[in-house]
Amino acid sequence: LESFFRNERIEIVDKALPRPGVVDVLKKLKDNGNNIYIVTARTDKHDDMPYERAKTWLDKNGIVYDRLIVGATNKVKVCKELGIDVFIDDQLNNCMKISQSGITTIRLTNSKEEYDHVVNMSNFNQIFEYICSLK
């Protein structure tokens, strides 16, 4: 069963498409002088090559980035070590932890629920405008 799950999950992830707008927005942010760090908790529990698979997917889909960090079970620590000043995620739990550490946090969601120090945005064009307004 574990082998089946691993193979099916890998196939599904490999075929997934990026969210609308993410490729263009990350390129514009990079062109504006921002560093782009991809921080994922993905580990080898269900994938024996998490870094390689993530890198292949990002490159295949034209997503620009400066550094890819996999296996980041403590994203707050990683963000602090890298000096990240804006964090984007769709997982509320991650957003809450990061925002409590003082990092500007954007949650990609359609939810109308509000949380202290977490900015909800529903698409990457909104995110781009918001980040530009911070400078």
Where are these regions (language model features)?
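Structural motif corresponding to alpha-helix initiation and N-cap regions
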Residues: 19, 23, 72-76, 92, ...
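A structural signal for isolated positions on well-ordered beta-strands in alpha/beta enzyme cores
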Residues: 35-37, 67, 86, 106
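Substrate-recognition "cap/lid" segment bordering the active-site pocket of phosphatases
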Residues: 43-86, 92-96
